[in-house]
UniProtKB/Swiss-Prot annotation:
Residues engaged in binding substrate: R92, R98, N131, R162
SUPFAM superfamilies, alphabetized: LDH C-terminal domain-like, NAD(P)-binding Rossmann-fold domains
GO molecular function, one term: L-malate dehydrogenase (NAD+) activity
Active site: H187
GO BP terms in the entry: malate metabolic process; tricarboxylic acid cycle
Gene3D superfamilies: Lactate dehydrogenase/glycoside hydrolase, family 4, C-terminal, NAD(P)-binding Rossmann-like Domain
Gene: mdh
Source species of the chain: Leptospira borgpetersenii serovar Hardjo-bovis (strain JB197)
EC numbers for this chain: 1.1.1.37
Pfam families xref list: Ldh_1_C, Ldh_1_N
Taxonomic classification: Bacteria, Pseudomonadati, Spirochaetota, Spirochaetia, Leptospirales
Name of the protein in question: Malate dehydrogenase
Entry function: Catalyzes the reversible oxidation of malate to oxaloacetate.
Length: 326
């Protein structure tokens, strides 16, 4: 067996946490030769529920799970961790705008950023899942300036998976045939799922799917609004699919990307594609297993440029609303 990875999961007793923890403990995130220690962070009121989840984890007798703890103390939960999965945030309810959440969540992510910088291992990497995840990530990162900016990620993999599923269904092919599907910008209803640069069975999507009006209309709208649709149908936000997105993101970061493919996550922009430097912006990415880089040189037509600008403008606006927290 290889090394042991220490993982902090915030909001661990919540619905996403509940779906996620068992997949981490079973080896689906870090692989079957890597032992894991899970350090759960929860609000004091949720500690009893978290202890129930710990009992269930113990009862699974996962060979890779070395230890699992829960605390409401940031310093304890983030001690010596290699990965921080920041799942917990004040949840979005039906009818609530994302803007309402910015200030509410800002204080949470200021404190978490500071505590991660103070307590985590020197190689720590952070994935923010709790919404609004791009700006929550921006706040945490700017309050942990001792941690290199290339260690911070916000999740857009769920959007990528949603988009792949829609394209596969429309084309009548298995979802694995859809590759190089980038999500640009914000994990919000302005995100741009880039079908122009994606492939189905190695061919451009626009060659395989002849209904270009669907691609430019319902496809994008379906991906952008999917989270809201699930809240409407289920009475609660995406949980198992979000947890799956977390597993997929971490695996994509730590595993070399297949030739000709890419994966989606939001990272601190280096100015690529004219984005404002330092914004947490969604890009198509490649990994060599250690370092992650932005896929360069992708073409944009006028339609794509307009979609790109809309999501970029929204992220600038979100950043401006939380400037005093950065």
């Amino acid at each position: 067996m290889g090394k042991t990875v220490k993982v902090a999961v915030t909001g661990a007793a919540g619905q996403i946490g509940y779906s996620l923890l068992f997949r981490i403990a079973s080896g689906q995130m870090f692989g079957t030769d890597t032992a894991v220690e899970i350090q759960m962070l929860e609000l004091e009121a949720a500690i009893p529920a978290a202890k129930g989840v710990i009992m269930e984890l113990e009862d699974c007798a996962f060979p890779l799970l070395q230890k699992v703890t829960v605390s409401s103390d940031l310093d304890i939960a983030f001690k010596d961790i290699n990965w921080a999965l920041l799942v917990g945030s004040v949840p979005r309810k039906a009818g609530m705008e994302r803007g309402d959440l910015l200030k509410i969540n800002g204080g949470i992510f200021i404190n978490q950023g500071k505590a991660i910088e103070k307590n985590a291992a020197s190689d720590v990497r952070v994935l923010v899942v709790g919404n609004p995840c791009n700006t929550n990530c921006l706040i945490a990162m700017n309050n942990a300036k001792g941690i290199p900016s290339d260690r911070w990620f916000a999740m857009t993999k769920l959007d990528e998976n949603r988009a792949k599923s829609q394209l596969a269904s429309k084309a009548g092919v298995p979802v694995k045939e859809v590759t190089h599907l980038g999500i640009w910008g914000n994990h919000s209803s302005t995100q741009y799922p880039d079908f122009y640069n994606a492939k189905i069975s190695g061919k451009p999507v626009t060659d395989v799917i002849s209904d270009h009006e669907w691609l430019k209309g319902d496809f994008i709208k379906n991906v952008q609004q999917r989270g809201a649709e699930i809240i409407k149908a289920r009475g609660a936000s995406s949980a198992a699919s979000a947890a799956n997105g977390v597993v997929d993101t971490v695996r994509a970061i730590i595993t070399p990307t297949a030739s000709g493919d890419a994966f989606s996550a939001a990272i601190a922009s280096d100015g690529s594609y004219g984005t404002e430097k330092g914004l947490i912006f969604g890009f198509p990415l490649k990994s060599d297993g250690k370092k992650v880089g932005i896929v360069q040189g992708l073409p944009f037509n006028d339609f794509a440029k307009e979609k790109f600008k809309t999501t970029h403008d929204e992220l600038i606006s979100e950043r401006n609303e939380v400037k005093d927290m950065l």
